[in-house]
Structures are given as structure tokens and as C-alpha cells.
């Protein structure tokens, strides 16, 4: 079944679920009907720390409490180069707007790192380095990135000192990401 969507298209969640015949929620959405796995990297509202390093996205696996395992959709993504499941990537820069990046390929070099879960506890997560199949990421306008950073800064201002300290501790070992933008 051919999915009709173009790189850079911005759609809503209802359109995404109709197009891919997948769940309406979650960052990893498996569809047996279309033999796809839809990944949503939500930069607006998410506990996960997905990061771009040039043309490679290090995507955080599924599981919001406790250590993540290589089960369910994490296993599907981990085995995606062998199991025939086509993996599609969307990014969210503004609420309810899903920007289609394209088909991605797992580079086979997954690793684990510490991140905070939804209860604020440190845990091990799986990180999956992904590359766009065509090698060309959709360039994101730098004003979109700046707006996103401002939104995150506003949410940080609402935290108390203890919450900020805990957040800083959890990010201490995390590499800084960078991405290609357009001015």
C-alpha cells in the first residue's frame, strides 16, 4: 500500500492516523494494515530527548516509566532493517502540526542513556540513530526553532528551584544536538 504524502507536508493527527491506519497517540505508532511504523518526534510537549546530529536523528525509544526494554515498538524499530516494516518520521514544532520528514532507516547502532521518566526518576532509555532514506532533511525555518526555544523557556520559568535542579542533573550527560536550519 503506497502512502501518499510528500516531504515537508504538514498535517494534523487525524490526517496522520487516517493515512497510516495507525493509533491516534504515542510517539511510535505501528500499523499492520500499512506495514509501517510512524515515529513522532515531538519537540513541543514530550518527556523524550530526541536530538539531531547533522543529518542523523537520535530518537528515544518507547516507554515513559522505568527502564525501557527492546520489546513492543522498540523491537520493531530495532529490527526494521530486517522485518520489512517501513519507518516514517514526523516532527512536531507547533502543537497539533505534524511535519513529514520522510522514510528513515535505523543505522543499527542503538545505545542506552539515562533520561528522566514522567515521574521525574532517572531511567535507561534506548536511543535509535536514524537517517533519512533520501539523506535530505526538510529544512526548518530558524524562526520556528526560536519560537520553540521561547516556548520551552517559558515553561522552565514555571518550575521551582528543586524541579530546575533535577532537570539540570538529568541533562548533564546529554550531548547537545544541532540541526540544519533555514533563515
Task: Give the residues covered by each predicted segment.
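Short beta-strand and beta-hairpin "edge-sheet" elements
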Residues: 99-113
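Short coil/turn segments at secondary-structure boundaries
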Residues: 52, 102, 117-118, 142-144
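Beta-strand-rich binding-surface signature
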Residues: 84-86, 101-103, 125-129
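ATP-dependent helicase/translocase motor core
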Residues: 120-183
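Acidic, glycine-rich low-complexity segments with interspersed aromatic residues
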Residues: 2-99
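Short proline/glycine-enriched turn/loop segments at secondary-structure junctions
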Residues: 113-121
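Structured beta-strand/turn binding interfaces of compact recognition modules in eukaryotic regulators
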Residues: 92, 107, 133
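Residue-level signal for secondary-structure boundary sites
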Residues: 47, 112, 136-138
Amino acid at each position: 500500500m503506497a502512502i501518499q504524502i510528500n516531504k515537508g507536508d504538514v498535517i494534523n493527527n487525524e490526517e496522520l492516523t487516517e493515512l497510516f491506519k495507525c493509533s491516534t497517540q504515542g510517539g511510535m505508532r505501528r500499523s499492520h494494515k500499512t506495514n509501517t511504523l510512524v515515529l513522532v518526534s515531538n519537540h513541543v510537549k514530550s518527556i523524550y530527548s530526541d536530538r539531531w546530529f547533522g543529518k542523523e536523528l537520535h530518537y528515544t525509544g518507547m516507554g515513559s516509566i522505568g527502564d525501557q526494554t527492546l520489546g513492543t515498538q522498540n523491537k520493531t524499530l530495532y529490527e526494521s532493517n530486517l522485518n520489512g516494516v517501513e519507518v516514517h518520521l514526523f516532527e512536531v514544532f507547533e502543537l497539533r502540526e505534524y511535519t513529514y520528514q520522510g522514510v528513515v532507516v535505523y543505522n543499527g547502532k542503538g545505545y542506552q542513556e539515562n533520561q528522566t521518566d514522567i515521574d521525574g526518576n532517572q531511567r535507561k532509555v534506548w536511543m535509535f540513530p536514524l537517517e533519512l532514506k533520501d539523506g535530505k532533511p526538510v529544512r526548518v525555518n530558524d524562526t520556528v526553532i526560536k519560537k520553540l526555544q521561547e516556548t520551552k523557556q517559558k515553561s522552565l520559568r514555571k518550575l521551582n528551584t528543586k524541579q530546575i535542579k533535577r532537570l539540570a542533573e538529568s541533562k548533564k550527560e546529554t550531548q547537545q544536538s544541532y540541526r540544519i536550519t533555514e533563515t
